[in-house]
Amino acid sequence: MTDIDTPASPLTPNSKAHLEVIAYNQYLQAKEQIQQLEHELTEFQESSKELELELEQELAESDKRQAKLEDRISALESEVTEWRKKALDAHKEAASTQQALQREVSSLRDAHKLVKERLRETENANDDIEQRERITCSTLEDIQTRYNEALENVAILEAELAAKDVLIGEHHRAKEEIKDLTEELEHTRKKLAIRDQELEDANKRIMNPPPATNHNATTHRRAVSGTAQVSAEGYLTPLTSTGAKPLSSSRSMQFIHGLQSQMRSLESRVAHVKSSLPKPTTPKRAKSSASAVSGASTIKSSPSMALLTRKLSEADDVVSLSPSRSTSSLEDLCTPSPSPQVARRDMSGGGSRLDLRADPRLNGRPKTQQPRPSYNSALATAKPLDPIEGSPTSLEGRNRTRSASPTKKLSSLSLNAPSLPQSQARVNIPALMRPASPIKQPSPPKPAPGSKFADVYGRRR
């Protein structure tokens, strides 16, 4: 709109014209605004139509999309319903499965606890069984040890019984021999007393001759020449049957003194033999195998019959009075039968048990019962002994005696250690008990039984 030209007249502010002008100006402004608003409205209507069309198109499209979405929603809802059902079913199934598994786990736990308890009980029972087994093994070993000790004690006692029987026989023989030796000693004493009396009578007759003439003295000398001759020292000198052969007085006195010393030695030895005879004792049951073995060794190392036989044989050689009782017969009578030798094992290793591996009782074989040695069997198996060493006269006989077994053999023993040699097991005679060595001279002949006493050269008085 164009502006309207107004006259240039001064107007007052409160004048009518001025107000009309103002109102007219406002009218013009309002009209312009209305036109502008109409134009804007038209534009707005056009744009709104376009917008409405677009919106309608969008609405149709959105309706289509909504329908599609609703269809999809319905499909999804159906799917959700199905999945819900499936989830519920799966949940129910999982719950049932979980309950079943829980029940199974609880049952397995109970079974595991039961198995643990059974295993614990089994282990305890196994420990008890092992302990019983150990106790049984130790008891069995103890019983076996006691059984072996009992077998050893039985074997040792059997050996002691056999040795006791042999010693009893030897004791009886020794008593008889001592009795015979006592009789021979008394016989020798009587002989020595008679000889001393004859010597004293002869000395008295020589020292105190009766008064006689020369003729009587010559006759007396001729009579005495056939019987005896007086020496310078005043001792009687025996003569032979052919002529008078004087004997040195020192030799005759030495013989007499030697005989006296031998008699004294014989008496002392007989007394020693009587005191050293073993007394028969009943063997007691050994407390242990070591004491039993030591007892057996004590029996073996005690004064044996070999020592007694040696003493008696030496006494028989010294006296030599009765030819009827010769040395061989005395040795045959006094020779002991071989006693069982129970040897011990080597103690250096600490072992004191006998070796019983060959025992038939351990191997299940019956033991053969054999008779005990008797006095007659001991006499029957006697062997002559050496009068000096108390052993068989020959080396072969000594070996045979060492290896000979007793009448009652201990077949249940198999001894590993060798027995002591006979020379070591024999007790040595003290030097004082040995007879005095006589002067080397020809031994006088033994008198015949029942004959009178004879002098040094065998002449009867």
UniProtKB/Swiss-Prot annotation:
GO biological process, one term: centrosome localization
Subcellular location: Cytoplasm, Cytoskeleton
GO molecular-function term, one example from the UniProt record: microtubule binding
InterPro entries: NUDE
Coiled coil: 21-206
Region entry Disordered, spans: 266-300, 316-461
Keyword Cytoplasm: yes
Gene Ontology, cellular component aspect: cytoplasm; kinesin complex; kinetochore; microtubule
PANTHER family: NUCLEAR DISTRIBUTION PROTEIN NUDE HOMOLOG (PTHR10921:SF1), NUCLEAR DISTRIBUTION PROTEIN NUDE HOMOLOG 1 (PTHR10921)
Family, as annotated: Belongs to the nudE family.
Name of the protein in its database record: Nuclear distribution protein nudE homolog 1
Organism: Yarrowia lipolytica (strain CLIB 122 / E 150)
UniProt lineage: Eukaryota, Fungi, Dikarya, Ascomycota, Saccharomycotina
Gene: NDE1
